[in-house]
Curated annotation (Swiss-Prot):
Locations listed in the record: Cellular thylakoid membrane
Membrane topology: Multi-pass membrane protein
Function, as annotated: One of the components of the core complex of photosystem II (PSII). It binds chlorophyll and helps catalyze the primary light-induced photochemical processes of PSII. PSII is a light-driven water:plastoquinone oxidoreductase, using light energy to abstract electrons from H(2)O, generating O(2) and a proton gradient subsequently used for ATP formation.
Cellular component terms (Gene Ontology): photosystem II; plasma membrane-derived thylakoid membrane
Protein name in UniProt: Photosystem II CP47 reaction center protein
Pfam hit, one: PSII
Gene name for this UniProt entry: psbB
Organism expressing this protein natively: Synechococcus elongatus (strain ATCC 33912 / PCC 7942 / FACHB-805) (Anacystis nidulans R2)
Family as reported in the entry's similarity comment: Belongs to the PsbB/PsbC family. PsbB subfamily.
Major subcellular site: membrane
Cofactor binding mode and count: Binds multiple chlorophylls. PSII binds additional chlorophylls, carotenoids and specific lipids.
Residue stretches spanning the membrane: 21-36, 101-115, 140-156, 203-218, 237-252, 457-472
Gene3D superfamilies, alphabetized: Photosystem II CP47 reaction center protein
InterPro entries, sorted: PS_antenna-like, PS_II_antenna-like_sf, PSII_PsbB
Length: 508
């Protein structure tokens, strides 16, 4: 059959056995990719520094998804939370990866079997002897099973009743760990940052799915609805499946880009809005103010700030930095973080404290501008030296460090002060190793950015697929040129007036 490449799926029309075979093969490919990708990531992952070199800085994609479901330890004796000499048993990163590869092999064999033995009696309508599928019944079966899975995931895995729970953390991504989570049934369950809502909604959605599945298994659709929605056509199944998938893809693109309950900061990196809104900066300032109010010096207050929290307050960790087509992990851009230099406080020769205006997300270059408490510009490093109105040399800018490796030091050399002002524009100042990975200094996005872009793109593609196949199945008669109310084949010359049966010609 001379089919063009874009029509090859026609071969599984009216062939339920091979329709199952291609779905089994697709699932085999997905499971095989997941397992293989996990082993590849484990081969290149460096677990030595969970604070400054976490998995999201190293470009890990499948490991964070395993970790958020409770798999955090390796047969290599390490854990992503920093512990060593751990014994995870079977459910380690490697164990889960191997399980996926074994599953992929079994699914491959099942696909081959169903491709060879396609003509099963199971798929034959006993009344007609033709291959047929009871699609409404299959819809009920799938709905029931997916509801059961959804309910079980929430009621057992996430709740800890029979499973590890899920990854939870504080609002600033410092204390992340896996623990059982109780469902939140009240209004607090609708807080998008509350993990208890995830558990409750899986249980509730699972119950709805189970009930709806049983309903569709026991109640047949009305004939008018069956015909109106083309429930007997396999392309209707394709269209509605595409709708479900594109809707889910849009939802997860949104939760990945905006939220961090299901996509924790420790595993996927910060969101861009946390940089835009100075989220971590405000928390650091609050902690410092609280410590100073309790009698601590500035050096002591800043030294108490966790390095992990300071590292989040750095623009290079924002997923909005770095273009979509810059390949590679974040560490290939600015380098591997080595340590926090400390918080730089800039002052002019009059002793006024100045603030470095921070780099906005969507700028690659930005002039260094230092403003006073009223927002007036007091010093700058413009793009062109000839345009400098408030040079560091003239205004006598100094940089004093609190916390970090430079704690207590004051820098007065203008060249060095400019260096640290450039770092301060990017958030908290860190030292980076750019040699190990030959980092090029151009920011990369995090797996949070890749996931969002990929799912938003495919959601749009699948949306058009839904419209296309939905139109084909609803208006199949129109596209085929056969109208529903056409009673007989019209032949030119059959009527004196074309199409008017009252003027039918009679044989002479």
């Amino acid at each position: 059959m001379g089919l063009p490449w874009y029509r090859v799926h026609t071969v599984v029309l009216n062939d339920p056995g091979r329709l199952i075979a291609v779905h089994l093969m697709h699932t085999a490919l997905v499971a095989g990719w997941a397992g293989s990708m996990a082993l590849y990531e484990l081969a290149i992952f460096d677990p030595s520094d969970a604070v400054l070199n976490p998995m999201w800085r190293q470009g890990m994609f499948v490991l964070p998804f395993m970790a958020r479901l409770g798999v955090t330890q390796s047969w290599g004796g390490w854990s992503i939370t920093g512990e060593t000499a751990v014994d995870p048993g079977y459910w380690s990163f490697e164990g889960v990866a191997i399980a996926h590869i074994v599953l992929s092999g079994l699914l491959f064999l099942a696909a081959v079997w169903h491709w060879v033995y396609w003509d099963l009696e199971l798929f034959t309508d006993p009344r007609t002897g033709e291959p047929a599928l009871d699609l409404p019944k299959m819809f009920g079966i799938h709905l029931f099973l997916s509801g059961l899975l959804c309910f079980g995931f929430g009621a057992f895995h996430l709740s800890g009743l029979w499973g590890p729970g899920m990854w939870v953390s504080d609002p600033y991504g410092l204390t992340g760990h896996v623990q059982p989570v109780a469902p939140a049934w009240g209004p607090e369950g609708f807080n998008p940052f509350n993990p208890g809502g995830i558990v409750a909604h899986h249980i509730a959605a699972g119950v709805v799915g189970i009930v709806a599945g049983l309903f569709h298994l026991t109640v047949r659709p009305p004939e008018r609805l069956y015909k109106a929605l083309r429930m007997g056509n396999i392309e209707t199944v394709l269209s509605s499946s595409l709708a479900a998938v594109f809707f889910a893809a849009f939802v997860v693109a949104g939760t990945m880009w905006y939220g961090n309950a299901a996509t924790p900061v420790e595993l996927f990196g910060p969101t861009r809005y946390q940089w835009d809104q100075g989220y971590f900066r405000q928390e650091i300032a609050r902690r410092v103010d609280t410590a100073v109010a309790s009698g601590a010096s500035l050096e002591e207050a800043w030294s108490s700030i966790p390095e992990k929290l300071a590292f989040y307050d750095y623009v290079g960790n924002s997923p909005a930095k770095g273009g979509l087509f810059r390949t590679g992990q974040m560490n290939k851009g600015d380098g591997i973080a080595q340590g926090w230099l400390g918080h730089a406080v800039f002052k002019d020769k009059n002793g006024d404290v100045l603030d470095v205006r921070r780099l906005p997300n969507f700028f690659e270059n930005f002039p260094i501008v230092l403003t006073d408490s009223k927002g007036a510009v007091r010093a700058d490093i413009p793009f062109r030296r000839a345009e400098a109105k408030f040079s560091f040399e003239e205004t006598g800018i100094t940089a004093s460090f609190y916390g970090g490796s430079l704690n207590g030091q004051t820098i007065t050399d203008p060249a060095q002060v400019k260096k640290y002002a450039r770092k301060a524009q990017l958030g908290e100042a860190f030292e980076f190793d750019t040699e190990t990975l030959n980092s090029d200094g151009v920011f990369r996005t995090s797996p949070r950015g890749w996931f969002t872009f990929g799912h938003a793109s495919f959601a749009l593609l699948f949306f058009f697929g839904h419209i296309w196949h939905g139109s084909r199945t609803l208006f199949r008669d129109v596209f085929a040129g056969i109208e529903a109310d056409l009673g007989e084949q019209i032949e030119f010359g059959a009527f004196q007036k074309l199409g008017d049966p009252t003027t039918r010609k009679t044989a002479a």
